[in-house]
């Protein structure tokens, strides 16, 4: 049976000397693994079109088990992501998070729309790091946890101007007048907590303007990665590469 589906490549694995296995997240929100024969041979015409982040119309045959890719009508190669190692790494963090948030046979149209949205925003020049924060925030509940950013979890005060950090002891933001109760709380500005709350709750189709200072994005990114580590025991391969890049920059 020949199948045609739009999708985005979220994973690639080399298979033997010349083949590879790709996984696309298709337009219906399903993960589809495909064998690509002779993918690493330039003459096959599939080498460039089966890279990570490629968005296109995938034509493949499938009877039982894994399908076999026949051709790709590329809509957007997202080539710019391969020109900047930081953008590529943060985009990889987006795909890795979405991939791991879904069961192998699960279907999530929202996941496809989220990935399509963030890759489009990165292409428009929006910070790839910021987009990774958006993905991590939107996927939290799929990993079995959530985070409270909009009020003090100790006093229940909703005065966000008084928030000074995130407490893993009390599982949420804390305000300055009770900060002494957790001296190990993760310190960050109330503006960062406010923006985390907005990005967590705001539907992606309402995120028209996304301009946040780099320092605040760094704070947000550091906290959400820590949240995944503490609450879900999650370690991301992409984040490991990002950390290595920053260490090299600081040598």
Swiss-Prot record:
Q: Does the keyword DNA damage apply?
A: yes
Q: Which GO terms describe its cellular component?
A: bacterial nucleoid
One Pfam family in the UniProt entry:
RecO_N
Question: What's a single GO BP term from this record?
Answer: DNA recombination
InterPro entries in the record, alphabetically?
ARFGAP/RecO, DNA_rep/recomb_RecO_N, NA-bd_OB-fold, RecO
Q: Which superkingdom heads the taxonomic lineage of this protein's source?
A: Bacteria
Keywords assigned: DNA damage, DNA recombination, DNA repair
Family annotation (NCBIfam families): reco
Q: Which PANTHER family match?
A: DNA REPAIR PROTEIN RECO
Q: What does this protein do?
A: Involved in DNA repair and RecF pathway recombination.
UniProt similarity note: Belongs to the RecO family.
Protein name, as recorded: DNA repair protein RecO
């Amino acid at each position: 049976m020949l199948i045609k589906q739009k999708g985005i490549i979220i994973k690639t694995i080399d298979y033997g000397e010349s083949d590879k296995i790709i996984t696309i997240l298709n337009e219906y929100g399903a993960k589809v693994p495909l064998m690509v024969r002779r993918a690493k041979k330039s003459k096959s015409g599939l080498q460039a079109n089966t890279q990570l982040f490629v968005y296109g119309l995938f034509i493949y045959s499938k009877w039982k088990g894994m399908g076999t890719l026949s051709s790709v009508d590329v809509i957007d190669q997202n080539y710019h992501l391969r020109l900047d190692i930081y953008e590529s790494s943060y985009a990889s963090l987006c795909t890795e998070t979405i991939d791991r948030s879904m069961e192998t046979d699960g279907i999530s149209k929202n996941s496809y729309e989220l990935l399509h949205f963030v890759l489009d925003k990165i292409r428009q020049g929006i910070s790839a790091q910021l987009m990774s924060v958006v993905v991590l925030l939107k996927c939290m509940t799929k990993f079995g946890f959530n985070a409270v950013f909009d009020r003090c979890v100790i006093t229940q005060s909703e005065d966000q101007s008084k928030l000074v950090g995130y407490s893993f002891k009390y599982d949420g933001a804390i305000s300055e007048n009770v900060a002494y109760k957790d001296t190990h709380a993760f310190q960050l500005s109330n503006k960062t907590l406010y923006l985390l709350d907005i990005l967590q709750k705001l539907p992606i189709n309402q995120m028209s303007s996304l301009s946040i200072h780099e320092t605040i994005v760094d704070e947000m990114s550091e906290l959400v990665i820590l949240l995944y580590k503490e609450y879900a025991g999650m370690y991301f391969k992409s984040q490991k590469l990002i950390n290595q890049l920053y260490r090299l920059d600081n040598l």
